Amino acid sequence: MGGFVASTAAADSDISVVAGVDKINNGEKFPIFSSFGDINVKADMIIDFSHPSMLEPMLEYAVKNNIPVVIATTGYDNSQTEKIRATAKKIPIFFTFNMSLGINLVAALAKKAAKVLGD
C-alpha cells in the first residue's frame, strides 16, 4: 500500500512523500528510515499502512512532532485501539480500516449478500 501512496503522490504536484519507515529500502525516490527515531526530515502528516507493532513508536513520533496521522492498519488489539483514541486527544488522527481495493470489494459484496439473504 505504501507503494500505491508513493506513486499516487508522484502523479500530483501538490503532494510529495518526504520519507518512509521500513526495514527494507526498495530504491524509493525518497529517504527510507529504519525507525521513527532516525527520521531527519519534516512532514506535514503521517499516512500509516504498516503493522500493529509499529503503532507505539509512530504515535510517539507524531505527538513529539505534532504531526497529524492517518491510520489505515488492521489487527490492533483493544489496548492499541485505546492508545489511538487517547492520542487523538493530543493530535489529529483519522483512524480507518484497511483501504485496499480487495478488502473494500469484499466488504461491499458482504453487505449486498446480507441484504439478499436476510437473517
Task: Name each model-derived stretch.
Residues G2-G3:
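N-terminal Rossmann-fold NAD(P) dinucleotide-binding loop
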Residues T8-P31:
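NAD(P)-binding Rossmann-fold cofactor-contacting core
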Residues V17, I32, V69-V70, I93-F95:
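Hydrophobic beta-strand scaffold residues
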Residues F33-K42:
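Short amphipathic alpha-helix with an adjacent loop that forms part of the alpha/beta core around
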Residues V41-K42, I46, K90:
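Alpha-helix C-terminal capping/helix-to-coil transition sites in glycosyltransferase folds
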Residues I46-I47, I71:
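N-terminal Rossmann-like NAD(P) cofactor-binding module of classical short-chain dehydrogenase/reductase
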Residues S53-N65, A72-A114:
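Rossmann-fold NAD(P)-binding glycine/threonine-rich loop
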Residues V116-D119:
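Short, structured loop/turn "capping" segments at alpha-beta junctions
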